[in-house]
């Protein structure tokens, strides 16, 4: 999944090494296999129709119009953010607000997976601050520097229902490719009340 918004301020100098990723999916060969690359990809579970996954990368969430906005309008009920967000004073609280706000605005589950402390450098410290929010509520919060996973259940049926009820949530699927995948259901004990 390519990154769309490249930070080039403060401690970030990504534009000297990278260019923004393309939105329209293209087929490339990688490790001897053909695969799609691009930001406008949705991954739909055959067994759970309400589970439609999309992804964005780190800075994309912090931008004025994150790719996740288009992902949700295209049908994503779960957005994953693969991030290497460094730690500064007050950033963990701000990150929580961003993740919760985006999940509320998009009527989706938002999974935020941060680089861990073992990935820190001499220039930046990463805390492994992993978060899961659903429709504005923070469901799981792995404390920074604790080395924990964020784990919970998601009520995807509720997300679909909320979108159907909200008349200003207008789906727009142009330019998106959906890749179906299989995920056989497994019975688990619920951990969420």
Over which residues does each language-model region extend?
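Enzyme catalytic cores with a strong preference for nitrogen-chemistry domains
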Residues: 1-193
């Amino acid at each position: 999944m390519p990154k769309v918004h490249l930070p080039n301020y403060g401690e970030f100098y990504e534009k000297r090494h990278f260019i923004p990723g393309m939105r329209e999916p293209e087929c490339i060969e990688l490790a001897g296999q053909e695969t799609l690359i691009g930001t406008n990809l949705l991954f739909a579970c055959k067994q759970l129709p309400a589970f439609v996954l999309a992804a964005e990368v780190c800075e994309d969430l912090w931008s004025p119009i994150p790719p996740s906005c288009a992902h949700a309008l295209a049908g994503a009920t779960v957005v994953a953010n693969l991030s290497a967000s460094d730690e500064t004073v007050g950033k963990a609280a701000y990150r929580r607000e961003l993740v919760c706000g985006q999940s509320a605005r998009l009527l989706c589950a938002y999974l935020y997976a941060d680089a861990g402390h073992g990935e820190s450098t001499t220039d930046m410290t990463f805390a492994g601050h992993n978060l899961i929010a659903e429709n504005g509520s923070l469901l799981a919060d792995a404390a920074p520097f604790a080395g924990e996973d964020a784990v919970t259940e998601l009520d995807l049926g509720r997300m679909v229902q909320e979108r159907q009820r909200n008349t200003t949530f207008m789906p727009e699927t142009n330019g998106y490719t959906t890749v179906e995948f299989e995920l056989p259901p497994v019975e688990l004990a619920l951990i969420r009340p």
